[in-house]
Amino acid sequence: MAVQQNKKTPSKRGMHRSHDFLVAPQLSVEPTTGETHMRHHISPNGFYRGRKVLKTKNDE
């Protein structure tokens, strides 16, 4: 079984874990409706990059 030879300092421990953080999702604002949505995803009402790309139940 592997056993460390020397204790890892708090600084080295932090450097080792430097990329283990959680990233908040990138959000965009839809220009036509002003709704917030995740990047590269359609908004809840069916708009993507200013165009209607999906029919929703509320559409006539």
From Swiss-Prot:
A GO term, aspect molecular function: structural constituent of ribosome
InterPro entries reported for this sequence: Ribosomal_bL32, Ribosomal_bL32_bact, Ribosomal_zn-bd
Keywords attached to this entry: Ribonucleoprotein, Ribosomal protein
Cellular compartments per GO CC: large ribosomal subunit
Domain of life of the native organism: Bacteria
Comp. bias regions, Basic residues: 49-60
GO biological process, one term: translation
Pfam families given in the database record: Ribosomal_L32p
Stretches the record annotates as Disordered: 1-60
Family statement drawn from the similarity comment of this UniProt entry: Belongs to the bacterial ribosomal protein bL32 family.
HAMAP family linked: Ribosomal_bL32 (MF_00340)
NCBIfam families: rpmF_bact
UniProt protein name: Large ribosomal subunit protein bL32
Lineage: Bacteria, Pseudomonadati, Pseudomonadota, Betaproteobacteria, Burkholderiales
